[in-house]
Amino acid sequence: MSTSPSRTDKIIVVDDDARIRDLLRRYLTKEGFEVSIAEDGKALNRLLLRESADLIVLDLMMPGEDGLSICRRLRAAHDRTPIIMLTAKSEDVDRIVGLEVGADDYLGKPFNPRELLARIHAVLRRRPQPEAPGAPSSENEVVNFGPFCLDLGTRVLLKNNEEQPLTTGEFAMLKALVRHPRQPLSREKLALLARGREFEPFDRSLDVQVSRLRKLVEEDAANPRYIQTVWGVGYVFV
């Protein structure tokens, strides 16, 4: 039985394969989403000029501007719309690079639409949830470290009072770390806390997101002060 989203979330599917666009449009619409489709980066640009999206499903391999370039361009423009990238199943390097340029998650082709649906729900759950008027924030904790201030309620990271861009996936990973200070977290635990799913052996994507966070919050990412590696275990926030 379908589990519809609590409100009508808007998803844009970007893929040069008309069959995949049509399949996902019909499937995700049936699951309760509002779906728009685009065959390439130019069509996506036209869509974003007239409508917003809660999430973008973005194919990596497309003629013209590919998915990596589109993702990089959106993030450079401080567009934080969550992105799930569709990649060739055997190309681990594509998945890693996709996360490095700011994608929130990925899924290898060919895929089961139900697996994509699960990824979509997991990514959307990481968003801030609107509070009822007058209700206290369900998560108003503020974490300060060095020159940084992370507001877990608004999901804003400040450095010396200047906002630092965070993708949905990066926020989820940083939140998992700061909520467990001085507690070494295994990759399995981090995957559950930040992504809501089990860690896949040989999957380097979690390490890639940690690396992106280090570049953002560490003065020297090669010698981290806050997000340290615990060899044989995982990572710890200190």
Go through each PLM region and give its residues.
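His-Asp phosphorelay/catalytic-motif detector in bacterial-type signaling
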Residues: 7, 52-54, 78-82, 200
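Acidic catalytic/metal-coordinating carboxylates
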Residues: 40, 66-69
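Active-site beta3 strand of CheY-like receiver
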Residues: 52-57, 62
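Positively charged, aromatic-enriched patches within helix-turn-helix-type DNA-binding elements
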Residues: 156-233
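Basic, amphipathic DNA-recognition helix from helix-turn-helix-like DNA-binding domains
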Residues: 72-144
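Charged docking surfaces used in two-component/phosphorelay signaling
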Residues: 22-30
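Short, Lys/Arg-enriched segments at the junction into DNA-binding effector domains
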Residues: 7-10, 122-184, 188
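Short hydrophobic/Thr-rich beta-strand motif most characteristic of the beta2 strand and flanking loop
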Residues: 32-41, 47
